[in-house]
């Protein structure tokens, strides 16, 4: 099987590529524009494989996408290419509209034109797997808002969409496009919506890598608001396994939620990281003393939580890592891979961090 993976140099995309090359006999064509968060060093361990090919291309480029489909003849698409950082979407939403909505449309059309020319057997087995986020659902009631002993709801595959940020609105739009191409044209699509990912090779603008690296450098550990926002945390390698399971075994037209069963307040995540660093690389004062509280971001959702029963029941997938085991692996990886970290921390990244966090008081 040959799988075309868009965004394969990104955080989740590179985990998917590594999983396929290291754990299956399938081939990968990695299509990536290599924007600031795309890093081919994340694929150094698999880039020499005969089953791996790289195409430096933008999913918004219709000519390039048509050529890539015609040249590589994939059996499936795993579409991960996206602008994905909520804070960046607030200060610069245009890139999110262009990549996440227009790019998905261009890719769908290239896939549809390619798929329509396949023989019946290949048409039936072809899959266009669109990887999305739980943020399209909006937010859920927080424990602070619940009555005593009241069970808190979870996001299911039938939860209504209510995106809060330009990022989540752009992903919701792309989800709707993918489902429309199934219903209108018959393209065999699948959508997955996942919770917050963490793990190795994560670009250091997101909470967990930002906290690890700032802590080690003696910098402030910025916490939005009171830090009581709740997220469900999913180890990225567990997510990669889930995505491969869906593209190879999932039913066309279906949606699958993917979660880690690890609801944590942001402040508790940060405290856990500080305690691990106190254990592994202790210093005179606890890393907890570097925690600082900054103004919350606009429209910040208070709670996300995934019901992943469907993928477990129908496809047999379950996460292997607990949050405790996964966060320890993550901290240890960043401590052991300082060269990777230094190479991704460009001047552009530094100026963005200063603008986004140091201006919040």
Swiss-Prot record:
CDD domains: dTDP_GD_SDR_e (cd05246)
Lineage start: Bacteria, Pseudomonadati, Pseudomonadota, Gammaproteobacteria, Enterobacterales
Keywords: Lipopolysaccharide biosynthesis, Lyase, NAD
Family to which the UniProt record says this protein belongs: Belongs to the NAD(P)-dependent epimerase/dehydratase family. dTDP-glucose dehydratase subfamily.
GO molecular function: dTDP-glucose 4,6-dehydratase activity
Cited InterPro entries: dTDP_Gluc_deHydtase, NAD(P)-bd_dom, NAD(P)-bd_dom_sf
Top EC category: lyase
Name of the protein described by the UniProt record: dTDP-glucose 4,6-dehydratase
Protein's UniProt keywords contain Cytoplasm: no
Pathway the protein takes part in: Carbohydrate biosynthesis; dTDP-L-rhamnose biosynthesis; Bacterial outer membrane biogenesis; LPS O-antigen biosynthesis
């Amino acid at each position: 099987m040959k799988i075309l993976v868009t965004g394969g140099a990104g955080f989740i995309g590179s985990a998917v590529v590594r999983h396929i090359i290291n754990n299956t006999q399938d081939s990968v064509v990695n299509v990536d524009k290599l924007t600031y968060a795309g890093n081919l060093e994340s694929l150094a361990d698999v880039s020499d494989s005969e089953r791996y090919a790289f195409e430096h291309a933008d999913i918004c480029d219709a000519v390039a996408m048509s050529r890539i489909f015609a040249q590589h003849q994939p059996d499936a698409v795993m579409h991960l290419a996206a602008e994905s950082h909520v804070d960046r979407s607030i200060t610069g939403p245009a890139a999110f509209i262009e990549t996440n909505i227009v790019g998905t449309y261009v890719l769908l059309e290239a896939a549809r034109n390619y798929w329509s020319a396949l023989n019946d057997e290949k048409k039936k087995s072809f899959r266009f797997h669109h990887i999305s986020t739980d943020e399209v659902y909006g937010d859920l009631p927080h424990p602070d808002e619940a009555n005593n002993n009241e069970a808190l709801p979870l996001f299911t595959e039938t939860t209504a969409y209510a995106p809060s940020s330009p990022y989540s609105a752009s992903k919701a739009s792309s989800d709707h496009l993918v489902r429309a191409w199934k219903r209108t044209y018959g393209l065999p699509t699948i959508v997955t919506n996942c919770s917050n990912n963490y793990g190795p090779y994560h670009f250091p603008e997101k909470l967990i890598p930002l906290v690890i690296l700032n802590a080690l450098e003696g910098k402030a550990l910025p916490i939005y608001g009171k830090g009581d926002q709740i997220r469900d945390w999913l180890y990225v390698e567990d997510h990669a396994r889930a995505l491969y399971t869906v593209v190879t075994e999932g039913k066309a037209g279906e949606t699958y939620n993917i979660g880690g069963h690890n609801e944590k307040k942001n402040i508790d995540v940060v405290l856990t990281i500080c305690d691990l660093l106190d254990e592994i690389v202790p210093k005179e004062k606890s890393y907890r003393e570097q925690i600082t509280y900054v103004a919350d971001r606009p429209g910040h959702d208070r709670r996300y939580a995934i019901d992943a029963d469907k993928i477990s029941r129908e496809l047999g997938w379950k996460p292997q890592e607990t949050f405790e085991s996964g966060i320890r692996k993550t901290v240890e990886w960043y401590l052991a891979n300082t060269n990777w970290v230094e190479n991704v921390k460009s001047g552009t990244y530094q100026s963005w961090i200063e603008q986004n966090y140091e201006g919040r008081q």
